[in-house]
Structure formats: C-alpha cells, structure tokens
Amino acid sequence: MKTLQATFFLVAFVPLVKPAPPIQQDSPKFYEYDTDIVTGSLIQQDYEMLPKDAIKDGTNVSLDTGLRLQADDSELSARPTKDTNLPTCLLCVCLSGSVYCEEIDIEAVPPLPKETAYLYARFNKIKRIAVSDFADITTLRRIDFSGNMIEEIEDGAFSKLLLLEELSLAENRLVKLPVLPPKLTTFNANQNRIKSRGIKNNAFKKLTNLAYLYLGHNALESVPLNLPESLRILHLQHNNITTITDDTFCKSNNTRYIRTRMDEIRMEGNPILLAKHVNAFSCLKTLPVGTYY
C-alpha cells in the first residue's frame, strides 16, 4: 500500500515541475550598446565639421558640440544659414553670445544669431560690408574684421548698432571711413589706404565715449579734425602728415585749455618736424612721439 501511495505521489508531482525558461539578458544590453554607437557617430560627425582651430581647443569643441546636439529641431531650423545651407554655428564656432569665424576663407559676413554680442571674423577674404549684414543684429558690442580685404562699407552699415563699443577694421583696403556708431570706445583702422579726404570733418566729433583711436600706417595728409575730448590714445604714426595747426589738438583762442584725458599721441614716421609746431602741443600733458629735429 505504501508503495502504491509513493508511486501515485511521484506520478502526480512530476508533470507539475518544468524547467524555467531561459532569462533574456542580452537584448537590453544590445539596444543600449547600439544607441551608444549611433550617438558616438553623431558626435564624431559634428566634430569633424568644426574648423581646425576649434578642434585644437578641446574645451570649446566639447561644450559647443554638446549644446548643439541638445538643440531640438525647431531651434536648428531657426538658425541662419549661408548660401550653402550650412548653419553659421557649424561653419563658425558659436559660444555664449560670441561667434568666431577666423581664418575660414569666407568672402562675406555670415548670417548671425540674433543674440550675437561679439563677432570675430579676422583673417578671411571679406571684401564688402552691407547694410543688410547687421540689419537685425542690435546686440553687437564688439566686431573684429582685422586682416580681410574690405574695400567698401555701405553707408549706414553700422547705424543700427547702438550698443557697439569696439570696432576693428585694421589691415584692410579701405580708402574712406564709414559713419561710426555713437557709443564706440575703441576704433582701429590701422594699415589701410585711408587719405584725409576719406574722413569727414565731423567723423569723430559726436563720439563722446571714444578713448582709443588707431589710424596708423595709412595715407593721411593731416590730423583728423574735431577730435573728441574723451580721447586718451591717438595713433597716427607712418602717414603722410605734413602740417599741424594750433587748433589741431588745442584751442588757439583759449590759452588755459588743457586736454586732461590725452595720454599718448604717436606721430613718428610722418614727414613733419614737430619742433616747428610747439604751440600746437601747449595744451597736452605729454608731447607727441615723433621727429622733432
């Protein structure tokens, strides 16, 4: 009887015991790994499209890349593009309101994000600046076009840049100066082809914040008129200046007048003997640098 009961229990229990199905562990790892591969490819592709100078700077590249990879489709589509449909922030390097477009051989000012405050477009092949280049960019505070081929700047190209404080047009091919925005503190036009007739009589008169004016290595025949009282540094070296009057820096009708802010005037390399114009410097704290005898 006991044998029959054991046999019955065994027969009844065995069918209920089945091997558990194998645990599927590989699938989640596979999909996760595959996602990493795709992300890595995007980062590498984005990295390769950046300028060489930006690639050398690992910090800027990684941060800028991360910001652009996180942007949604609507933000990317809103970015301004060049004729090649390549976003400016891939052609250049955009970071915290600054746009760096240096040494990439562009021939025109690239479309800029509306929040741009600082533009560095040095050492390119830009030949012309148009009114439309900055028509919608009112936040600019600094522009650097040094080392281009700029020959022409349309009238009013900078007229809407009411916040612009620093402008460099050094090492270009300008023969005349554009109308400058009112809040400039620094203007650099060294190493151009500017003659005195290319500067209007009141070009600097209303620039009451202008402290640094660089016009060295041009073709000026005389010192620009109506220089603002705010000037601290004036560079006119290596021009063709042949004459200075008592009203160039001072006021001939006011012997007590002193230019209190002027710290430096450079005039070396001009065909003029400064010793012949002593009265022209009577209001200055320091004599200009140049040839006296």
UniProtKB/Swiss-Prot annotation:
Where does the entry say this protein is expressed, by tissue? Expressed in many tissues.
The intrachain disulfides are 250-283
Q: Which UniProt keywords apply?
A: Disulfide bond, Extracellular matrix, Glycoprotein, Growth factor, Leucine-rich repeat, Proteoglycan, Repeat, Secreted, Signal
The yes or no answer to whether the keyword Electron transport is present is no
SMART domains with a match to the protein in the record? LRR_TYP
Per the record, the major location class is: secreted
Keyword Lyase attributed: no
Q: Modified after translation how?
A: Contains keratan sulfate.
- Cell location: Secreted, Extracellular space, Extracellular matrix
InterPro entries per UniProt = Leu-rich_rpt, Leu-rich_rpt_typical-subtyp, LRR_dom_sf, Mimecan/Epiphycan/Opticin
LRR repeat start-end pairs: 107-126, 127-150, 151-174, 175-194, 195-220, 221-241, 242-272
Glycan-modified residues: 60, 240, 253
One Gene Ontology BP term is:
articular cartilage development
Question: Which Gene Ontology terms of cellular component type are present?
Answer: extracellular matrix; extracellular space
Q: Which family does it belong to?
A: Belongs to the small leucine-rich proteoglycan (SLRP) family. SLRP class III subfamily.
Q: Which PANTHER family match?
A: EPIPHYCAN-RELATED, MIMECAN
Tell me what this protein is called: Mimecan
